[in-house]
């Protein structure tokens, strides 16, 4: 199984697209089976079926609600692997250990 990440920002045009690339690079280097997509906060509900983990800035993460086996990771610096990396790995290792190579 592949862990599915959704990067969310306010408009879905800038930050989330860059965050998608940064998260993809980080997870590839960490040997995690994954896919990463991005969208605006107003679109995340329509994208939830294709996501296991939502990653967003802390102020946007507070607006996101999920149920079931889905998780929200709020980060201060969406572009810094030093900030989002440990938080994302913690959720993946706890809930999606089969995706860690």
Swiss-Prot record:
Induction: Induced by L-ascorbate. Repressed by UlaR. Keywords: Cytoplasm, Kinase, Phosphoprotein, Phosphotransferase system, Transferase, Transport. One of its GO terms (molecular function) is protein-N(PI)-phosphohistidine-sugar phosphotransferase activity. One of its GO terms (cellular component) is cytoplasm. It is found in: Cytoplasm. The active site is at residue 9. Coiled coil: none annotated. It comes from the Bacteria. Its main location: cytoplasm. PROSITE patterns: PTS_EIIB_TYPE_2. The keyword Disulfide bond does not apply. The keyword Transport applies. It catalyses: N(pros)-phospho-L-histidyl-[protein] + L-ascorbate(out) = L-ascorbate 6-phosphate(in) + L-histidyl-[protein]. GO terms for biological process: phosphoenolpyruvate-dependent sugar phosphotransferase system. The modification Phosphocysteine is found at residue 9. Residues 3-96 form the PTS EIIB type-2 domain. Its EC number is 2.7.1.194. CDD domains: PTS_IIB_ascorbate. The PTS EIIB type-2 domain is phosphorylated by phospho-EIIA on a cysteinyl residue. Then, it transfers the phosphoryl group to the sugar substrate concomitantly with the sugar uptake processed by the PTS EIIC type-2 domain. The phosphoenolpyruvate-dependent sugar phosphotransferase system (sugar PTS), a major carbohydrate active transport system, catalyzes the phosphorylation of incoming sugar substrates concomitantly with their translocation across the cell membrane. The enzyme II UlaABC PTS system is involved in ascorbate transport. NCBIfam families: PRK10222.1. This is Ascorbate-specific PTS system EIIB component. The gene is ulaB.
